[in-house]
Amino acid sequence: KSKTSLQMFQCLSISFKGRGELKSLSQWEIADQPRRILGDDLILAMYANELILRLLPENDEYSQTFSSYWTFLSSLNDLDSNEKEFALRNFENQMLEDLGYGLDFGFDINSEPINEDLHYEFNEHQGFSINSNGTVQGKTLLNLSKHETITNKIELSFLKKMNRKRLKSLLGDKPLKSKELFFVK
């Protein structure tokens, strides 16, 4: 038995044994350095964990989601607030992609390439459509299609609202507990 204490948000290599759904932890090993996540960063990390617990099926491998999650957690202490928000949205987008709900940010609902000079509206069931009063610029969508970092507050606000709509249909009516923490502080 190890006397090393486990830390929250620390990567572990673990092995289980047993039959059926109830398994026993047979071995664990720390796979990285402990990280200190506090305050608002802790709430963001708990939100990411809750999404994983609520949306990803047990015992299925989602290596790209894990990689995006780990990048997000590892960078929390090094980013400013806008960069953290983008890293979180990037994690959400990767998870949605892995679950089969990804978006092609390079094309509209008519399979036409996004035009950087036009405005678009988002519909969670169809995608992006040209709308002169749309909430997002084509340039923003093209930047997302190229996986470029976005730190503009207006663009981040759009991403947050868009992902909220996309996640709501998967999460159902049961609210996320981690969101309640934002209102307590």
Model regions and ranges:
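Non-catalytic alpha-helical scaffolds and adjoining flexible linkers that form interface surfaces
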Residues: 1-185
